[in-house]
Amino acid sequence: MTILDLAEKSRYLPGLSGKSLLAGSAELSRNIKGYPFPGSADDKARKAVEDLAEKAVGRWNREEKDPLFPFPVAALTSNERALLEDKGFLPGGIGKKSHVVLFVNGAGTLSVLVNGEDHLLIRAAGSDPDKLWRTVSYVDSFFGKDIPYAFDQEFGYLTASPYRAGTALRMKAELLVPGLIGSGALEEAARNAARKGFSIRRVYDAVDMKHPYVALSNEVTLGVSEETLAARMAQLLEDLEVAETMGWSKVFRSREMALKDKVWRALGALKYARLMDGEETLAAAALIALGIRENMFPDKEKNLVSQLLDAASGAYVKETTHKEELDEEGEALWRAVLVRNCIESAGF
């Protein structure tokens, strides 16, 4: 399996073009008792952590039906690392540090990063917060039979960042919420999330009707059980979906023809443009999602929006075309080729 194979298997959630949820994940950080955090560890300590992790992964692969495949990060190209960062598998700025290994299953839905910000980062991707939590918890317990975790009776699981101490569980979701933005309801939604220990933040440079993408994640990990965090996440996603549906109904009714015009113009640009930058592609993907939401056209393969969001990534364009040295114009040219192919494959 190549990095590109992994990227294409771990797209945004398929079949949800009419919904606000685009991607979801649960991340569980763990550190090993008796070893310094990766950021302050020497090569010998990092190698020892890698060896312990490999032992646990080896037993997993022998006993479980969902094997994990290794990707030593230092052996990857800079563009491959950038693509894995875009996909959420790697933290930013990890570079070519020694003994950093990413283990991933064949579907790209389960991964274990060794020697990242913490010794282990167990990550599961999907749409159901409870299932995601149970998945990372199962892996955590399985690995815990081979690995002594760093745990404090007062502070819980110890992490490199004090903001993750306690459960060390981070629930995340990326959403498309033009209804909340256009109706002015996003601020109230953010306040509601904050009351439950979560935050709503921008994904890209701005949050507006052109780029209506937001990220939801928990800010509290100490003093709250994992089950409670997962349940709160599920409830917030449900509340946001209801609020988005109501908000979008108001926005669409008040600007129906203007919004439909924007959708058709976006489709035309995707179908015929010869240069497309990432920002324009993100904006067009949002409009196409809204067109599908309003049944203006079908999404036969249930993955058109996710393909367009992938194409917005410069690393994805370079990896797909095998042209890592593309300049800005070359990247825009090849992105336009990719999105035209997406539109053609979708039957437009």
PLM-predicted stretches and their roles:
Residues M1-E154, L169, I181-S183, E187-F348:
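Long, Pro/Ser/Thr-rich low-complexity/intrinsically disordered regulatory tracts in eukaryotic proteins
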Residues G156-L175:
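Conserved phosphate/anionic-ligand binding catalytic regions in large, soluble enzymes, centered on
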